[in-house]
Amino acid sequence: KEIYEIFSKEDASSQADRCIQCGDPFCHSKCPLHNYIPFWLKATSAMKRELAFNLSNETNPYPEITGRICPQDRLCEGDCTLNDGHGAITIGAIETFISEEGFKKGLKPTFPGITTKKKVAVIGAGPAGLACATYLLRAGIAVSMYDKQNKAGGLLTYGIPGFKLDKDVVARRVRWLQEAGMDLHVNTHVGKDVS
């Protein structure tokens, strides 16, 4: 069980409401994914949770995971303008809240379906492989993913302890990728079992 509690609606809204919508948002520029942080903070503050969910999934292949494990104190939260004397907005906790609230309401990231004749094999079902599969599926490209382990997730599944990242969170994201058209082949060592 994870040791951090998910924000309540009130806590998420009041934290998001602290965002001053900077003209040049340092949180956005410091984020390696260049997430639309001010936009989904504004949507959360206005209680537009479906919009916040869609915005957070637009630039991030798995916001429910990065909200939990990304080192926000050195990235987005570390560069938050409010960090100078007022305390940064708890961006990671809000990101997790947005995802989990969306999932409770039945929201899922949208994929167009396989719309091209292109096929790509992704070797390794760790964070980079899952992100790659996400972007390929968003482009309508069929994905076959191979991993020698018996579960997808790589470091997310085998390296990060469950008290920090519940493994069901990773499994849920993998299921969605499979529903979107990804074929997953675990227990398959590329170069040995297949070539």
Predicted feature descriptions by range:
Residues 1-119:
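Ferredoxin-type iron-sulfur electron-transfer modules and their immediate structural context
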Residues 1-5, 34-47, 55-57, 84-92, ...:
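Beta1-alpha1 glycine-rich phosphate/pyrophosphate-binding loop at the start
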Residues 193-195:
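Short, intrinsically disordered, charge-balanced linker/junction segments flanking boundaries
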